[in-house]
Curated annotation (Swiss-Prot):
Protein name: Ribonuclease HII
HAMAP family referenced in this protein's UniProt entry, alphabetically: RNase_HII_A
GO MF, one annotated term: manganese ion binding
Keyword Nuclease set for record: yes
Keyword Manganese on entry: yes
Gene name of the encoded protein: rnhB
InterPro entries: RNase_H2_suA (IPR004649), RNase_HII/HIII (IPR001352), RNase_HII/HIII_dom (IPR024567), RNase_HII_arc (IPR020787), RNase_HII_hlx-loop-hlx_cap_dom (IPR023160), RNaseH-like_sf (IPR012337), RNaseH_sf (IPR036397)
Cell compartments where the protein resides: Cytoplasm
Residues reported to bind a divalent metal cation: D7, E8, D105
Ranges where the RNase H type-2 domain occurs: 1-207
GO biological process, one term: mismatch repair
Length: 207
């Protein structure tokens, strides 16, 4: 049975898009992925991730959903939380690729609830588990593509801000990202900043 793996990158970032990737791995091709060294993207070097992502895109059918910072802010303003934003993105991929079975990294604290919602909305046989990117090689493959795609977006944005010291990884814990944000007032924030994030809201309240 062909299996679709889905994972995301950039969920907690204050800068840049949330990227969701889906990869269909044909039956028995998981052995090939193991030989290629496919594992959770966070355990790979950026260079290795780039190489593997290119190979995976050539070898397998895949799909990407890129949700911009502005779209995230707009949806949150409409009362749609981050888990729902991710679910909507995953459902687009499930609809586009229409697999026999899908395995996804559960974003809801209750994995079974998330699994049932995806399955009911799409009619696809879905398995949703926490840490699926560690436990299922199909999800690891999706993780690699999602992370590489997001890294490419961040690198492109960074080009315009090198003279300011760069934007860092885009995550709130990154000192370079924190420093970058201090260059702007809340109203001056570039459109790739998630203004609805607590990190930025705190800056607004302190100005």
């Amino acid at each position: 049975m062909d299996v679709l793996g889905i994972d995301e990158a950039g969920r907690g970032s204050v800068l840049g898009p949330l990227v969701i990737a889906g990869v269909i791995v044909p039956e028995k091709m998981d052995i090939v992925l193991e030989r290629m060294g496919v594992k959770d993207s966070k355990r790979l070097t950026p260079n290795r991730r780039t190489i593997l992502s290119r190979k995976l895109k050539k070898m397998f059918e895949y799909d990407l959903v890129v949700i911009s910072a502005q779209d995230i802010d707009n949806m949150r303003a409409d009362g749609i939380n981050l888990n729902e934003i991710e679910r909507i993105g995953m459902e687009k991929i499930l609809s586009n690729l229409n697999p026999e079975k899908a395995i996804v990294d559960a974003v809801d604290i209750k994995a079974e609830r998330f699994q049932n919602k995806l399955a009911n909305d799409t009619g696809v046989n879905v398995v949703a588990e926490h840490k699926a990117d560690d436990n299922y090689i199909e999800v690891s493959a999706a993780s690699i593509i999602a992370k590489q795609e997001r890294d490419a977006h961040i690198a492109e944005i960074n080009k315009d801000y090198i003279k300011m010291g760069g934007i860092g990884s885009g995550y709130p814990s990154d000192p370079i990202t924190k420093k970058f944000l201090t260059n702007f007032t809340y109203d001056e924030m570039p459109d790739f900043v998630r203004k609805s994030w607590a990190t930025v809201e705190k800056m607004k309240n302190s100005q």
